[in-house]
Amino acid sequence: MAEAAESVVVSFEEFKKLRLIIGRVLEVKDHPSADRLYVLRVDVGGGKEKQLVAGLKGRVPAEQIQGKLIVVADNLKPAVLRGERSEGMLLAATDGDKVTILTPQTEVSPGSVVS
């Protein structure tokens, strides 16, 4: 996982451009051509699904991601990572070698906006 860019300061107006929503992980697959990546299929509400590529393999078991509610950066420009399209990014915290996926404290519907 990338380290936070501590020296970068963004305005509140810039921050508001990022859309954070809740998604539910429907499927976790090993990336076909990368040892440290998973390919996730995520329900983002409104009958829509997105594919995310996440650098969690080897740090978080797939079984701990499957079915989980996650926080998704929903409006990032899509990227292709090692041949797989990623249409957003899940949020996680890193403390040394420990990675924790950010999740809501209670059950909320996919597509719910994080504010």
Cite the ranges covered by each PLM segment.
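Phosphate-backbone binding interfaces of nucleic-acid-interacting proteins
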Residues: 1-115
